[in-house]
């Protein structure tokens, strides 16, 4: 399904394939010989999404340009099934495996890899030809690679990046307090409301 969003419609090269039940929404540009497979979602919220040539976007991947964070994928990249990319930059010849997540402001330099269920956290930069192992977490710049059980070490790098402020525009609550989910959901509801006026192009 191809959708116009905020008066912008996708531009898809004629040589590319978008599966019938994939969604391409809004200010999205897709280059030559790209394959967007079944169930994949490519959504430009309030920032554009640009996908280069010869890219493979596999089943149920989610690729999203978000508020203040456009998303760009270079040439010859593969995004695996159920992967999630939000507001990041992916340079040429990058491999993102099944179930991997890449968050806002992250940069994956040329030839890097994020293996199965790997995570590249907020504002993290992967150097060229760098690899994130299966289930491990990349965080910071310069990057550190940590296993999921290293919560305190991950938090030490992640906390100053202030995920709630960066992503939702809400400062992190005082120590020991939980995030204000009512405010976060209200912000997200307002951001997503314009989808009510989407127009189906094909």
Stretch-by-stretch model annotation:
Residues 1-41:
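Extended, small-residue-rich solenoid/repeat segments and analogous flexible loops
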Residues 1-9, 45, 59-60, 70-73, ...:
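Glycine-rich hexapeptide-repeat left-handed beta-helix
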Residues 40-41, 46-76:
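A glycine-rich, hydrophobic loop/mini-helix early in the fold
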